[in-house]
Amino acid sequence: WRVCFISVRHSDRGLVSELSKEFYELGFEIVATRGTAEIIKQNNIPVKVVKKVAQGRPHVVDMIKNGEIDLVINTSEGRQSIIDSSSIRRTALEEKVYCTTTIEGGKAVCSVIRNKDYWTVEKLQTLHDRLNI
């Protein structure tokens, strides 16, 4: 994971600074649409601006298809935003790029990445044996 694309609806803009700061501190480069990027920049977090789909190429969908985006956080409202978001989310799914549609989902991803060393992977059979199932 190295590049996080963030584009949020107006009602989520008050929460985006904290979220982008967390991802930046985890080593992510932040890429955002113009409106979201302006909020992020106000908090001294480096951010690269990318075009929305309706603004012409190259845009965020091109970046996802080219393997330039590793994580998508995309909340939307309004007709054009929902249209743009559907192509972003569909492309993320097709390209196997993790996509969350809520700020809370983004916070959960941060938490998992931050605490990844505390997680272990076990076979289901091992858990069954331990629990006597």
Question: Where are each of the predicted segments found?
Answer:
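Histidine/acidic-residue-rich catalytic or RNA/ligand-binding cores of hydrolases
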Residues: I113
